[in-house]
């Protein structure tokens, strides 16, 4: 893979410079636990002819968007027999307008209904033109968690919910949920049960301390 950029690189609005102490490499970002796909997405958010500003806000936005896209594609494989999204192709043909291509992918994802595996496979094929969504949703969640199994904490939270419904005291549920959110874990509680997933700012050490 080759990444090119023809304009100034910034970090949180300031020029990237060793003298300012804000210089880092892609390897540094990976060592911080930021997935490579998130780094790629942040880069693609800015056209290569424009100044690129690396910010924590963009990292969070990229992570959240990838979470959504992976939730849509689930465990499907790319269907290369389908023609890719013409809006994505047109954006890339327009002087590699990667930002417009990303927005086209997001719009495409928004039209896909749950269970429509054919459409999901088409989205995955289109995303592949940008080097995105190379894995399954489960693989993505596992990567973000650093291999940490969240199922035990999910089961504990569900047990607390059941007990709280009987006692009408939800303080233990709220406490564990708050701790999980503070550790960067997304908590989804439905009638079917509890689903935990790594979110933006996932802190593996904090999660381990909750076990």
Placement of each model-derived feature along the sequence:
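Second-shell residues forming the walls of enzyme active-site clefts
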Residues: 1-5, 13
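Structural preference for alpha-helix termini/caps and helix-kink/transition segments
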Residues: 15-17, 21-211
């Amino acid at each position: 893979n080759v990444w090119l950029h023809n304009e100034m690189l910034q970090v949180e609005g300031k020029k990237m410079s060793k003298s300012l102490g804000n210089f880092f490499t892609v390897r540094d970002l990976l060592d911080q636990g930021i997935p490579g796909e998130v780094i790629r997405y942040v880069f693609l958010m800015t056209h290569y002819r424009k100044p690129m500003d690396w910010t924590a806000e963009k990292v969070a936005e990229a992570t959240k968007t990838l979470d959504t896209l992976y939730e849509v594609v689930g465990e499907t494989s790319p269907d290369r027999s389908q023609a890719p999204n013409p809006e994505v192709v047109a954006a890339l043909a327009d002087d590699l307008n990667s930002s417009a291509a990303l927005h086209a992918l997001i719009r495409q994802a928004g039209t896909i209904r749950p269970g429509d595996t054919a459409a999901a496979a088409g989205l995955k094929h289109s995303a592949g033109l940008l080097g995105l969504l190379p894995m399954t949703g489960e693989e993505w969640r596992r990567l973000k968690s650093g291999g940490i199994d969240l199922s035990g904490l999910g089961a504990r939270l569900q047990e607390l919910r059941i007990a709280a419904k009987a006692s009408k005291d939800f303080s233990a549920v709220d406490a564990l949920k708050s701790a999980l959110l503070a550790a960067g874990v997304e908590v989804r509680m439905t009638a079917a049960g509890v689903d935990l997933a790594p979110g933006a700012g996932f802190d593996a050490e904090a999660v381990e301390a909750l076990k």
